[in-house]
């Protein structure tokens, strides 16, 4: 299926559901507590991220779409933290504050990229009057192209049928991430997105693909759904619609670090794509690609348009290929969250030859990700003369980005990449040739940050200058 990204800026989506705050405490562990046989974590980093329905809204906003969020919170620090974090990414919050209940909060303690324990702070919102939520939905319907109901069984969606009816009356598609085995509650929805275990809790264990499809189709008919999307972890996802053959989308995940919030990403991207004008099949394709990206990150995460674009071009995970500096910083930060070692090198790379390819492959072996910073055309002319470069910057970067050894390619305008290196601060700075480490641009900054600097040899007798001269001699 060939799919291009829509203009997400024209999409408006309302998310209604169980909002929560995800807290993360990070730190090293080096000993066992004398009080009990448990590790001692010396916490050095604390993060707060919107979770649950709030993470769905974050995923929608990260694509550039207009995201509105309705949910139940307490009147406490967690609610204020949620509003602050969501406003930073332009999610429009319209929470119903319940003074008698705390905002749902989940605290995770992690060390060396491993989750050690999760602590939940919640009472749920059962018994809370849903009328204010109905009123907020009614007001938002004229301005949205899709309604997402994100159900974590915490109380915000206890009265879900009136919400479905309001949306269907306004001809707005209703997408639901369900919870529990009572799918009767979701009758008449446009689409349900259960994972495989949630699906089998309703229809029973499926022995094979045929059984899954048949039982899924029956579920669509029984509950008057327009479609059902079953997310199946490493087996991808399957879209079922009456009167149409099943659409199976294989997983695009290359590495799985954390599945936290992956379902939020799927329904968020799917809703944004539908609201932007994509078909259901195209929207599922994009959601599947986004899921392949987000499981390669640690914790509840979102997907940017550049990451999604790279994923549907076949380069998933954190986003690969040619990037600007801001995109590169995001990609590097995500790589570091996963504990990956980042290597960086630079050059003109005017006519890519065997020496370049060998050098870049050797540089990549020294870490997990390789950044190649490339001199702009103006920078190259200043260094090499008016007749250079032979190949313009765009072509040089595309060729470099196609190499298996290269993860990220970024241009720079200055004569040296010192400023860029100081901004990125790679774990290892590499340069080819006869340099001494202290002569390499950016070496002082990398050392000061605790990184390494290394010189690699180029293949003897192979250079761009020699190739150009040989071409000239051949023409002579």
UniProtKB/Swiss-Prot annotation:
<dbReference type="InterPro" id="IPR023030">
    <property type="entry name" value="Bifunc_HldE"/>
</dbReference>
<comment type="similarity">
    <text>In the C-terminal section; belongs to the cytidylyltransferase family.</text>
</comment>
<dbReference type="GO" id="GO:0005524">
    <property type="term" value="F:ATP binding"/>
</dbReference>
<protein>
    <recommendedName>
        <fullName>Bifunctional protein HldE</fullName>
        <ecNumber>2.7.1.167</ecNumber>
        <ecNumber>2.7.7.70</ecNumber>
    </recommendedName>
</protein>
<dbReference type="InterPro" id="IPR002173">
    <property type="entry name" value="Carboh/pur_kinase_PfkB_CS"/>
</dbReference>
<comment type="pathway">
    <text>Nucleotide-sugar biosynthesis; ADP-L-glycero-beta-D-manno-heptose biosynthesis; ADP-L-glycero-beta-D-manno-heptose from D-glycero-beta-D-manno-heptose 7-phosphate: step 3/4.</text>
</comment>
<feature type="binding site">
    <location>
        <begin position="195"/>
        <end position="198"/>
    </location>
    <ligand>
        <name>ATP</name>
    </ligand>
</feature>
<keyword id="KW-0808">Transferase</keyword>
<keyword id="KW-0119">Carbohydrate metabolism</keyword>
<comment type="subunit">
    <text>Homodimer.</text>
</comment>
<dbReference type="Pfam" id="PF00294">
    <property type="entry name" value="PfkB"/>
</dbReference>
<dbReference type="InterPro" id="IPR004821">
    <property type="entry name" value="Cyt_trans-like"/>
</dbReference>
<keyword id="KW-0418">Kinase</keyword>
<dbReference type="InterPro" id="IPR011611">
    <property type="entry name" value="PfkB_dom"/>
</dbReference>
<dbReference type="Pfam" id="PF01467">
    <property type="entry name" value="CTP_transf_like"/>
</dbReference>
<comment type="similarity">
    <text>In the N-terminal section; belongs to the carbohydrate kinase PfkB family.</text>
</comment>
<keyword id="KW-0511">Multifunctional enzyme</keyword>
<dbReference type="GO" id="GO:0097171">
    <property type="term" value="P:ADP-L-glycero-beta-D-manno-heptose biosynthetic process"/>
</dbReference>
<dbReference type="GO" id="GO:0033785">
    <property type="term" value="F:heptose 7-phosphate kinase activity"/>
</dbReference>
<dbReference type="InterPro" id="IPR029056">
    <property type="entry name" value="Ribokinase-like"/>
</dbReference>
<keyword id="KW-0547">Nucleotide-binding</keyword>
<dbReference type="InterPro" id="IPR011913">
    <property type="entry name" value="RfaE_dom_I"/>
</dbReference>
<comment type="pathway">
    <text>Nucleotide-sugar biosynthesis; ADP-L-glycero-beta-D-manno-heptose biosynthesis; ADP-L-glycero-beta-D-manno-heptose from D-glycero-beta-D-manno-heptose 7-phosphate: step 1/4.</text>
</comment>
<feature type="region of interest" description="Cytidylyltransferase">
    <location>
        <begin position="344"/>
        <end position="476"/>
    </location>
</feature>
<comment type="function">
    <text>Catalyzes the ADP transfer from ATP to D-glycero-beta-D-manno-heptose 1-phosphate, yielding ADP-D-glycero-beta-D-manno-heptose.</text>
</comment>
<dbReference type="InterPro" id="IPR014729">
    <property type="entry name" value="Rossmann-like_a/b/a_fold"/>
</dbReference>
<keyword id="KW-0067">ATP-binding</keyword>
<feature type="active site">
    <location>
        <position position="264"/>
    </location>
</feature>
<keyword id="KW-0548">Nucleotidyltransferase</keyword>
<feature type="region of interest" description="Ribokinase">
    <location>
        <begin position="1"/>
        <end position="318"/>
    </location>
</feature>
<dbReference type="GO" id="GO:0033786">
    <property type="term" value="F:heptose-1-phosphate adenylyltransferase activity"/>
</dbReference>
<dbReference type="GO" id="GO:0016773">
    <property type="term" value="F:phosphotransferase activity, alcohol group as acceptor"/>
</dbReference>
<dbReference type="InterPro" id="IPR011914">
    <property type="entry name" value="RfaE_dom_II"/>
</dbReference>
<dbReference type="GO" id="GO:0005829">
    <property type="term" value="C:cytosol"/>
</dbReference>
């Amino acid at each position: 299926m060939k799919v291009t990204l829509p203009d997400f800026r024209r999409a408006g989506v309302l998310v209604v559901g169980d909002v929560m705050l995800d807290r993360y405490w990070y730190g090293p562990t080096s000993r066992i507590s004398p009080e009990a046989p448990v590790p001692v974590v010396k916490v050095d980093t604390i993060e707060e991220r919107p979770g649950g329905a709030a993470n769905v809204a974050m995923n929608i906003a990260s694509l550039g779409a207009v995201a509105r969020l309705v949910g139940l919170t307490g009147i406490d620090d967690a609610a204020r933290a949620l509003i602050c974090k969501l406003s930073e990414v332009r999610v429009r919050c319209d929470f119903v504050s319940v003074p008698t209940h705390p905002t749902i909060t989940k605290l995770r303690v992690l060390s060396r990229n491993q989750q050690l324990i999760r602590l939940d702070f919640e009472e749920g919102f059962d018994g809370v009057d849903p009328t204010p939520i109905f009123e907020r939905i009614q007001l938002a319907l004229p301005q949205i192209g899709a309604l997402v109901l994100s159900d974590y069984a915490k109380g915000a969606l206890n009265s879900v049928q009136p919400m479905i009816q309001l949306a269907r009356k306004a001809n707005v598609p209703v997408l639901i991430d369900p919870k529990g085995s009572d799918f009767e509650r979701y009758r008449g929805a446009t689409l349900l997105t259960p994972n495989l275990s949630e699906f089998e809790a309703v229809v029973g264990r499926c022995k094979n693909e045929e059984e899954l499809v048949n039982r899924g189709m029956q579920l669509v008919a029984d509950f008057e759904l327009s479609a059902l999307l079953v997310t199946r972890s490493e087996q991808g996802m399957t879209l079922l619609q009456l009167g149409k053959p099943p659409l199976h989308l294989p997983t695009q995940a290359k590495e799985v670090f954390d599945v936290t919030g992956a379902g939020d990403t799927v329904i968020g991207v799917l809703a944004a794509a539908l609201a932007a004008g994509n078909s259901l099949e195209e929207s599922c394709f994009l959601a599947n690609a986004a899921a392949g990206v987000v499981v390669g990150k640690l914790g509840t995460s979102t997907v940017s348009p550049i990451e999604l674009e790279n994923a549907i071009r076949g380069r998933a995970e954190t986003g690969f290929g040619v990037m600007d500096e801001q995109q590169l910083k995001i990609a590097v930060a995500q790589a570091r969250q996963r504990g990956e070692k980042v290597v960086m090198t630079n050059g003109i790379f005017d006519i890519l030859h065997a020496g370049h390819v060998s050098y870049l492959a050797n540089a990549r072996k020294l870490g997990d990700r390789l950044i190649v910073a490339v001199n702009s055309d103006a920078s190259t002319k200043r260094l090499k003369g008016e007749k250079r470069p032979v190949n313009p910057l765009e072509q040089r970067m595309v060729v470099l980005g196609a190499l298996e050894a290269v993860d990220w390619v970024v241009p720079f305008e200055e004569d040296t990449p010192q400023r860029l290196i100081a901004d990125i601060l790679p774990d290892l700075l590499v340069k080819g040739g006869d340099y001494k480490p202290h002569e390499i641009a950016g070496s002082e900054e990398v050392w000061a940050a605790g990184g390494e600097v290394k010189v690699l040899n180029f293949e003897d007798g192979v250079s761009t200058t020699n190739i150009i001269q040989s071409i000239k001699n051949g023409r002579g």
